[in-house]
Design a protein with these regions (language model features):
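Basic amphipathic alpha-helical segments that dock to polyanions
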Residues: 26, 36-50
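N-terminal, charged low-complexity regulatory/assembly segments
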Residues: 161-168
């Protein structure tokens, strides 16, 4: 069974496919333990999101899961107004494709964040730290949040942008 950190690891591998990596380096980048990354890679391979032999993302399967399944497997949990990092429709790249609204922005709670808005619990607790270190991963994670929490239009646009990024 997939765990939220499996998505973080899989998205990191998708963001940097073709680049060499080790479990230790990936763990450091994502704020996880090496054994946690290893277990995440194994689970993602078992579920068909990564090739179990090459440990590379199976992009069509990953995209299908993100567009059609992630919001049901890892539902969004909204909270009170907090300081944090922008996500979902409030963050680039999704915000560039949608008309601005006057609603409160969505943020992952994060002490080093520069925005205030309605909090959205990230897929796992290390997401803001990892996203702060890696702009490509940040873009993918915010698009996934657009799918998890957005209305029909936001989900449609997020799926389109995610498809474009993952098909590169």
């Amino acid at each position: 069974m997939l765990k939220p950190q499996d998505m973080l690891v899989t998205l990191e591998l998708a963001a940097h496919e073709g680049e060499p990596w080790t479990y230790e380096a990936l763990a450091s980048e994502l704020g996880m333990s090496a054994s946690g990354v290893h277990a995440a890679v194994d689970r993602a391979g078992t579920c068909g999101l990564l090739n179990p032999k090459t440990r590379t993302p199976l992009r069509p399967a990953l995209l299908e899961f993100l567009v059609h399944g992630v919001r049901y497997v890892f539902p969004a949990e909204l909270g009170r107004r907090r300081r944090g990092m922008l996500t979902g429709a409030s963050a680039v790249p999704l915000s560039q494709h949608l008309a601005s609204t006057e609603t409160s922005p969505l943020v992952w709670p994060y002490a080093r964040g520069e925005a205030r808005g309605e909090s959205l619990t990230p897929l796992c607790e290390t997401v803001p730290i990892a996203a702060d270190r890696d702009p490509e991963l940040y873009a993918l994670l915010t698009l996934v949040d657009g799918i998890r929490v957005g209305g029909a239009r936001v989900r449609e646009v997020a799926a389109g942008v995610l498809t474009e990024l993952l098909r590169r």
